[in-house]
Amino acid sequence: MDDRDDSSYARAPEPDDLIRICRSLNDAGARYVLIGGFALIAHGATRFTKDIDLLIDDSPDNVARVKRALSILADNAAADVQDTDIREHVVVRVADEVVIDLMGRACGLSYTEVAADAEQRQLGDALVPVASPATLIRTKDTYRPQDAIDRAFLEDLIKRRQSPEA
């Protein structure tokens, strides 16, 4: 195993890392949606995350765009991702200076389904497609304690958005 495949060598991503990566994805014309912890943070949650979760269009052309975009990272670990990996594996972990988890589906939801109601969020100088709160709830349907906390936050956010005072 190559050292760059070991996520213990990566550091926790910071907001500036996310912005830089999303800017590069946008410049490459990659089709992606931010999910996971950073999506919750983009919606106002206060939480820690140790990786960047991206739901991507798993077509070979788009995988090539994502790999090109992620080549800005120090170790270019994304170069090891094969065109079919996203379709063949639940999660493809790119352990570079930060860890990025690439998925073609999240809890049964495809990129196309999630992108349909994604919200565009301005994060720094990058316009980022972020999974909607309703979609994020569907991706948090697990038994992990953090997912229960995230679901409660998202349900409250949806209620606040539907409130007349919102």
Which role does the model predict for each range below?
Residues 1-166:
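Compositionally biased terminal segments of proteins
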